């Protein structure tokens, strides 16, 4: 019969508990409103910063599809944004991932479902600088315009422009070398 592994004793007394990133994430969800959410990430990221993004993804623990397929750091999408999702996202926000995007100027669009009585379904658009822009949506990620918003925007053209801005996806995620390729400088001789 296999015995359960006992937690290790910590220096100075007490027991050290080992937790996986999934169980740490589950603990956060037990203390927060958890909803479905997905995020698209794009822009240019220096290769030396890619490990930071990987660690943030591990911390938030999303998948690459709704079936829960884990993210593989070697599978960077070609020609499109990185898509990540999960059914149990604390407060509908990928905190670590979004923090890395803010620090490194990466674009993202995040949609999260509503938590009745706490917060509405929303799409967040971040273009790599400034503040993330919230857009009210349905549970199917369709933009909702309140009468106040319609009045503020004023014309059908302005409403359509606002709609297009909110529906725009980030550019592809591109990992770039930190140092540009060696540049050969030709010396011009004056004669």
Task: Please state what every model-predicted region is.
Residues 48-55, 59, 69, 74, ...:
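Polar/charged alpha-helical tracts
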Residues 18-19, 188:
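Intrinsically disordered/low-complexity terminal segments and short unstructured peptides
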């Amino acid at each position: 019969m296999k015995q359960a592994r006992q937690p290790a004793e910590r220096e100075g007394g007490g027991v050290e508990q080992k937790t996986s990133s999934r169980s740490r994430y589950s603990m956060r969800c037990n203390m927060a409103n958890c909803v479905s959410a997905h995020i698209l990430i794009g822009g240019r990221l220096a290769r030396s910063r890619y490990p930071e993004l990987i660690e943030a993804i591990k911390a938030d623990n999303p998948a690459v599809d709704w079936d829960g397929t884990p993210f593989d750091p070697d599978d960077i999408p070609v020609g499109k944004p990185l898509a990540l999702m999960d059914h149990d996202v604390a407060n509908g926000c990928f905190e670590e991932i979004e923090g890395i995007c803010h620090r490194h100027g990466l674009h993202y669009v995040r949609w999260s479902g509503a938590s009745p009585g706490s917060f509405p379904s929303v799409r967040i658009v971040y273009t790599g600088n400034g503040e993330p822009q919230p857009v009210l949506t349905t549970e199917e990620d369709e933009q909702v315009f309140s009468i106040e918003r319609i009045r503020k925007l004023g014309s059908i053209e302005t409403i359509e422009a606002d709609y297009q801005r909110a529906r725009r996806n980030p550019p592809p995620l591109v990992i770039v070398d930190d140092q540009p390729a060696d540049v050969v400088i030709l010396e011009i001789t004056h004669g």
